[in-house]
Amino acid sequence: MTQLTMKDKIGYGLGDTACGFVWQATMFLLAYFYTDVFGLSAGIMGTLFLVSRVLDAVTDPLMGLLVDRTRTRHGQFRPFLLWGAIPFGIVCVLTFYTPDFSAQGKIIYACVTYILLTLVYTFVNVPYCAMPGVITADPKERHALQSWRFFLAAAGSLAISGIALPLVSIIGKGDEQVGYFGAMCVLGLSGVVLLYVCFFTTKERYTFEVQPGSSVAKDLKLLLGNSQWRIMCAFKMMATCSNVVRGGATLYFVKYVMDHPELATQFLLYGSLATMFGSLCSSRLLGRFDRVTAFKWIIVAYSLISLLIFVTPAEHIALIFALNILFLFVFNTTTPLQWLMASDVVDYEESRSGRRLDGLVFSTYLFSLKIGLAIGGAVVGWILAYVNYSASSSVQPVEVLTTIKILFCVVPVVLYAGMFIMLSLYKLTDARVEAISRQLIKHRAAQGEAVPDAATAASH
């Protein structure tokens, strides 16, 4: 099997640094931007997140079907990075622009730009996420590739947490509307450049012909009959929902519960560093264990850490910082494993039915992710609206403070319990995955299919 170089790993990972600008901005900044800068109410924001994300999620399987049927001189997946980079940067910037419109006009503008943002993210991210299957066929190399991917994705998070807010202050000079727009201009342009770097440095080493007799209905029916795909999608929906609830509550937690808004940049920065190194250490720390068993134990560990943060008095700032750093390091050792699940399900489906559905599996995985994103974003907005959170109040009532703590610490733990249950039903252990990989390699060799394609690999 192909041994990946550092160029392969870093080149691929930089694509998720670019995607991370949008993902992390949506997770950590957009809720605050919409309520406190743009001027939306929390209730409208929550509804916008839900409706926009559900509409967008429907396009993910359609994108997957398109990817599975795309073959160009640049390969199957890489062309979408080339075509989508510039629209990606433009829409990212427009989402954080505050127009001088009426209240109704602003709502319409927010809906249009947010939907466009999620659509262009889908156009780039679905094929990007599906690429590991044609970069390498080795499960261990895929783990290493995903570790570097999420290390560099966390660099995108670091840019948001460590650079975005200072840029807002520097560019805006007290005007947050100008500041957010200017900061996202810088980050959007950087994202375009990084997507092009990813395009030129990655290689699709394996090619698969479009399989005869395929149809949308047949492909969807196959996946619906795949128990491991169903478990994977339910798992990812809960995992994403937990991330978004916690991430969406982060700035509120620092500003109101800890009562130190000036520490927001440091809180996000240190958390991003922990995220980076947790992802990078994943294959080294967990590679020696069965991935499913290790994942379950890690869920227990970070659930306990989250509950410790909940019971820690707000005045113990250093302890909260330390626990948050520990939480994010431990949590993110499992992030590469989440995406390995999708690659494993692709191989499992091929061994089960003979159909290789990289695009459809990863797009439906992203569909689950976006449903989780929609629910999580809506939960934050609706619950804050229910307890009468007001952005104009510098001091929040005790009920609001307690609710923010619950959103940050307790609601995610409930979802972690659901993730644990899903993993208890998941059967694609290391031994099973390696056996499937060997089986597929023998079958392809016998059929003369999917051998490394030097011409395709060299096509940049």
Swiss-Prot record:
Gene name linked to the record:
yagG
* Designated name of the protein: Putative glycoside/cation symporter YagG
> What high-level taxonomic lineage is stated for the organism?
Bacteria, Pseudomonadati, Pseudomonadota, Gammaproteobacteria, Enterobacterales
Pfam families (alphabetical): MFS_2
Q: Which family does it belong to?
A: Belongs to the sodium:galactoside symporter (TC 2.A.2) family.
Acyltransferase recorded as keyword: no
**TM segment ranges:** 10-30, 31-51, 79-99, 107-127, 151-171, 180-200, 263-283, 309-329, 367-387, 406-426
Q: Which NCBIfam families match?
A: gph, PRK09669.1
Please tell me the species this chain comes from: Escherichia coli (strain K12)
| Any single Gene Ontology cellular-component annotation | plasma membrane
Q: Which GO terms describe its molecular function?
A: symporter activity
- Where is this protein found? Cell inner membrane
> Which PROSITE patterns does this chain map to?
NA_GALACTOSIDE_SYMP
Cytoplasmic-side stretches of the chain, per the record, are 1-9, 52-78, 128-150, 201-262, 330-366, 427-460
Which sequence ranges are listed under topological domain Periplasmic?
100-106, 172-179, 284-308, 388-405
* Keywords (A to Z) from UniProt: Cell inner membrane, Cell membrane, Membrane, Symport, Transmembrane, Transmembrane helix, Transport
Membrane topology of the entry = Multi-pass membrane protein
**BP-aspect Gene Ontology terms:** carbohydrate transport; sodium ion transport; transmembrane transport
